[in-house]
């Protein structure tokens, strides 16, 4: 997850996210949000459909479980085929391995724009994220297969101990200060550091820049072109999780049918 930009969600955006989802997440501080006296009328309610789908829909649960099941099958195959013993998996955390939608829902209900990310520090310290369905089991399997696991996230380094504690509470393996790599160097540089010591056989994320620095700051048209170029990776050594709650696609113009609206009488 990447830290940047404001957020807009629409029902059409949610539908488009069912197969491939990207997201961006900005810098987070720890200030307290002020509640609106009339939250039902505030602009951030436009986030509601995407957030409701991510947190409450059985379809989201199915996609998450499906992704981790297939990733687990591919992981076993890759371990059997690998000649190197220094194998590694790299994963993002937020909305990839752990679910933080309770924070987003709290902010939205208080009419606070969660795209500002100024409430995230409090969540890192005191919040109770849940595991994405299938995630803990997948990483436990990787651990049993002797694969090193690196958690790369743009959570704040100052809250590293709290993030480690949250991951341990959710039964994620190989959680240490060496293997939980938080905000500092760009994600691409953190991945490169791991690649110098291991053969990375799989990556997981909820945004395209979780896989390659080529996607960082790329416009949507460029992202789609890169997805075509990288198609062989998806479902093989790259696995992307759905996240329609925020993303670099938020302000994209929608293509619409130009026929005159007619309703049946």
Indicate residue ranges for each PLM-predicted region.
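Non-catalytic pre-domain segments flanking phosphatase-related domains
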Residues: 2-14, 18-91, 252-265
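C-terminal cap/substrate-recognition subdomain and adjoining C-terminal extension
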Residues: 156, 160-265
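Surface-exposed patches in mature extracellular/periplasmic domains of secreted proteins
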Residues: 79-88, 149-154, 179-180
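Active-site neighborhood of HAD-like aspartate-dependent phosphohydrolases
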Residues: 81-88, 97-129, 144
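Short, acidic loop-to-helix structural element flanking the phosphoryl-transfer center
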Residues: 121-150, 157
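Soluble non-cytosolic domains of exported or imported proteins
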Residues: 43, 58-69, 84-85, 125-133, ...
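Structural recognition of the beta-strand scaffold that forms the well-ordered cores
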Residues: 88-91, 98-99, 148-153, 201-204, ...
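Sec-exported extracytoplasmic/periplasmic mature domains
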Residues: 76, 80, 103, 140-148, ...
């Amino acid at each position: 997850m990447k830290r940047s930009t404001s957020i807009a969600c629409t029902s059409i955006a949610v539908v488009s996210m069912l197969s491939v989802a990207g997201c961006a997440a900005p810098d987070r501080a720890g200030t307290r949000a002020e509640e609106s006296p009339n939250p039902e009328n505030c602009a951030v309610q436009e986030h509601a459909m995407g957030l409701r789908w991510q947190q409450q829909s059985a379809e989201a649960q199915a996609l998450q479980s499906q992704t981790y099941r297939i990733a687990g099958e591919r992981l076993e195959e890759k371990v059997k085929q690998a000649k190197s013993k220094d194998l590694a998996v790299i994963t993002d955390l937020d909305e990839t391995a752990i679910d933080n939608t309770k924070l987003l829902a709290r902010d939205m209900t208080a009419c606070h724009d969660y795209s500002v990310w100024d409430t995230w520090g409090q969540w890192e310290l005191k919040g109770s994220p849940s595991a994405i369905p299938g995630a803990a089991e997948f990483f436990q399997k990787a651990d049993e297969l002797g694969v090193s696991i690196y958690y790369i996230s743009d959570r704040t380094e100052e809250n590293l101990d709290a993030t480690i504690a949250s991951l341990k509470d959710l039964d994620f393996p190989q959680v240490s200060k060496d293997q939980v790599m938080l905000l500092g160097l760009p994600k691409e540089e953190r991945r490169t550091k791991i690649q110098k010591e291991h053969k990375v056989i799989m990556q997981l994320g909820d945004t395209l820049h979780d896989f390659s620095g080529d996607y960082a700051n790329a416009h949507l048209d460029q992202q789609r072109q890169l997805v075509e170029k990288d198609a062989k990776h998806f479902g093989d050594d790259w696995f992307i999780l759905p996240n329609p709650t925020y993303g670099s696609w938020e302000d994209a113009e929608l293509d619409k049918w130009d026929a005159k609206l007619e309703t049946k009488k």
